[in-house]
């Protein structure tokens, strides 16, 4: 993450900030699963089941949130800041949480409350329309944080990928195209396309060809068709008639 001409990065041996002018790194804390910077110049860091709030101007001024004390028993995966300045993080098995500044606590969004497709969440980001995009083991949730309205896109149905796991990424493009990574590939789509009604086409088969030869009803074609192909309910072919 680049913020105020500085690069913030987490590695196996810790979380660091790099001055882009001098190329010098400074150690901040031990390695984090995820981190974000809010509009008040605070660095929020997820480490295990702990959340740390650190002032960028005064790194020694920190606050520690032991998440199990707030009923968050599972390990968080990703944390982010929205354009409105809200802090959200997803928990694998625990759903989605928002930090409430007024109460200094966390508001929970879950599958049981109807806000999420699944509680097993891997990643979260914000779309250009200020919806939250949350990936999970069942698919993608679009959550409007202001109204609470949701839209679900399930794996294998709305999305051509069949599974999502921890580490699969999300990308929101300027033209509103969305990219979601899965275990079996990458898919892209537009949010508005999910709401388009599928057309119910009435399809029928007009002609039958076997080995580039048109098949007509009657014995001349080997009895494959007893009547015209559009009116045939079924046909039987042998192993030599598979082309």
Task: List PLM regions with ranges.
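Surface-exposed loop/turn elements that mediate protein-protein interactions on large endomembrane-trafficking
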Residues: 16-20
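Residue-level "micro-hotspots" composed of small/polar
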Residues: 27-31, 49, 63, 67-78, ...
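Conserved beta-propeller blade signature
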Residues: 6-9, 42-45, 86-89, 131-134, ...
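Sequence-structural signature of mature extracellular/luminal beta-sheet repeat domains
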Residues: 4-6, 42-43, 52-53, 58-59
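Solenoidal tandem-repeat scaffolds enriched in leucines and small polar residues
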Residues: 7-11, 27, 33-39, 43-47
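Soluble non-transmembrane domains of integral membrane proteins
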Residues: 12-13, 214
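Residue-level detector of Asp-centered blade-edge/turn motifs that repeat once per structural unit
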Residues: 2-4, 37-40, 81-84, 126-129, ...
């Amino acid at each position: 993450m680049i913020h105020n001409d500085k690069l913030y990065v987490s590695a196996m041996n810790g979380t660091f900030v790099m001055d882009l002018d001098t190329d010098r790194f400074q150690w901040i804390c031990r390695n984090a699963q995820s981190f974000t910077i809010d509009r008040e110049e605070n660095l929020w860091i997820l480490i295990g089941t702990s959340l740390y709030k650190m002032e960028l101007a005064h790194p020694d001024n920190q606050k520690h949130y032991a998440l199990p004390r707030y009923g968050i028993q599972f390990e968080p995966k990703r944390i982010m800041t929205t354009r409105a300045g809200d802090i959200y993080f997803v928990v694998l098995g625990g759903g989605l949480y928002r930090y409430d500044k007024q109460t200094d606590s966390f508001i929970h969004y879950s599958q049981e409350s109807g806000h999420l497709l699944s509680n097993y969440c891997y990643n979260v980001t914000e779309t250009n329309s200020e919806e939250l995009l949350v990936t999970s083991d069942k698919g993608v949730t679009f959550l409007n944080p202001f109204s609470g309205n949701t839209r679900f896109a399930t794996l294998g149905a709305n999305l051509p990928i069949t599974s999502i796991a921890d580490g699969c990424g999300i990308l929101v493009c300027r033209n509103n195209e969305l990219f979601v990574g899965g275990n079996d590939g990458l898919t892209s789509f537009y949010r508005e396309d999910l709401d388009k009604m599928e057309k119910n086409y009435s399809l029928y088969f007009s002609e039958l060809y076997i080995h580039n030869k048109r098949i007509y009803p009657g014995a001349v074609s080997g009895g494959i068709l007893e009547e015209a192909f559009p009116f045939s309910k079924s046909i039987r072919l042998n192993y030599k008639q598979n082309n």
